[in-house]
């Protein structure tokens, strides 16, 4: 876990968790959120959820029982943390103690999660069995208070990334890697869960009443050599308009052909961050643009495969 100061009032720290705790974070940082001035991170390979202060000092951790599936993604609201898991489980934890206070069981391998108006929107992505992979079209709507399923929405195949902005849910589905490709949808909870297709995208970020998309098409057929072509576009929530033109200006040329692993938006400044991976060849690179898409800088992100970026005061 790296620390970066956009205002340049502090040095970049490659491994702030080790600096603060004199211990390694563990195997495979999967996802991280900021909530009530604390950081919560899933360390998937080491099978635990950790709570830290915004300086990276560990406060608590919750070890995932061996009988349960791998942890995946997080959402938070009203004093609780919600964690999706493979094997069909959403775990509800007290944000201050990391004590389990409720669970939802259903589905198979659960991925992205977002909270909106007391409901949890959870992607039920796929099942793996002896016959191979079975991809699903389920987006569960769960009552966050009692952790009961309210309804199941039928969405595009293999739903994965789920985000909320301005009372709307945005979803990226991964298809079946054959005749069904990646897709982006908007779901409107206040309009009967109406669904709108927004295009083809592999990743997205939300903020400032905008949704920023990328379709990062990477050819792995000559692995470990890869080739990538990126298409950037955006959706303005206020005007309900898709802009098929790139939201980036004067971007470094290499970004057009680098595999995008994550995007994030500074919720105060509106700056857009795009992280690319070079897999095991080297550390990833982070590209920073202002809210108008003007290129600001790029920097080594401090490790391979940048996955999540959160912003603190």
Which stretches of residues belong to each language-model region?
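Predominantly soluble domains enriched in secretory-pathway, periplasmic, or organellar proteins
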Residues: 2-313
